[in-house]
Amino acid sequence: MNPKLRSILFWIHLICGLIVGLVVGVMSFTGAAIAFESQIIEWADRDARHVTPPAEGAPKLTLEEMLAKVKEAKPAVPPSGVTVYPGAESVVSVALGRGATVYVNPYTGEVREPGAQGWRSFFHTMEDLHRWLAASGDNRAVGKAITGVANLAFLFLGLTGLFLWWPRKWNLRAMRPILWFRRGLKGKARDFNWHNVIGFWSLPVLVVLTTSGAVISYKWASNLVFTLTGNEPPAAQGPMAAAPVVVPTPAPGTQPQPLDAQFAAVMKQSNAWETITLRLATPPGAGAPGGRPEGAPRGEGGQRGEGAQRGEVGPRGEGGPRGEGRAEGRGGPKGPQASAFTVREQERWPLFANNTVSLDPFTAQTLKTETYADFNSGRKVRTWLRFLHTGEALGWVGQLIAALASFGAVFLVYTGYALSWRRFVPRRKTQAVAPPAPVAPPAETNINAA
């Protein structure tokens, strides 16, 4: 590389890193902290989600009865979603508003609070820091803007860092110090070695994380995915591009089918399933205050989706990875709304894929079934980017890789600041004062008189 160009890139890289380094460090640390949120919550919630049937083949309450129990126990916030599981020893999960969940014993109607409140509070704090630096109210938009710009700057730092890393000579002696850790180094040499090695090995993952983060943060980036794949961008930010499902107008006085009948119709046409979720109509403004938007994935403030519910229409862990679609009634702007169910099957690919089944609520007849295969190419790529951002697209292995790369980014911030400090604030070298040279005693003069 031309030395002059290299010098220009170096100073741009350094100044940009100094400006956004702290924000990048916070985002990287919190990203690593919430990497395995779903598995930890599932483990901590294991007792709260388990029930003992009173007898083999004991009848369950109807879903309407369970919802009535929830409304009685939680009158302030209306139910917004219901998730059922196939096991006889499983609870029914009921979402409240936009950020809370309770479990219902299907045999007794007992309403339980989720366990792991400490873990939930911790992850909620980490996500708020990750997405908008824990800002609240009107300042949340400012925090989100700062993290969005810092994410783009981090992508730029990664690319310029690769140019600066590029060895002048491609031989083992020149490349070894920038490809692997060296023992016995201290101070500037150690930080330089760490910065180069960690940056090189984590760069591919960090490019994916920052690129996908930009697509999540910015509508123009999300639209670009659809444009590059030759598809019309959806009106709303995110991958949701399905048209409303039209429900035939029923005869006057016709009542909707019971929820159990609607769930049974969906179960009948589904393969071995893990969860089935129905989002209920919620009055405007009924969301739980302060709750994370229903299904809003990390870094994305929109709907959750194609897949499951991270914000707990179904508790994470039962529903699998955070999704981007919504299980909710959908129809035309006027007229009856379709009952839209999100089905997570056991045998699925990609791992985040869900099926959406839209029913006529008055007849329980299927109006439309949409699977991942039905998505256009833009929506497929957009959804992959959403789950690559958390690593969930590749299961726990992907989550581990994303966590390690995020943790590596924390060290990049540390070593970057340490190298900058040594550059701008050099250590004062104390010069040892040489002891004064010993003074020779005066020579004796002997005068011998003759």
Spans of features found by a protein language model:
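Conserved histidines in hydrophobic membrane contexts and catalytic metal-binding motifs
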Residues: 1-450
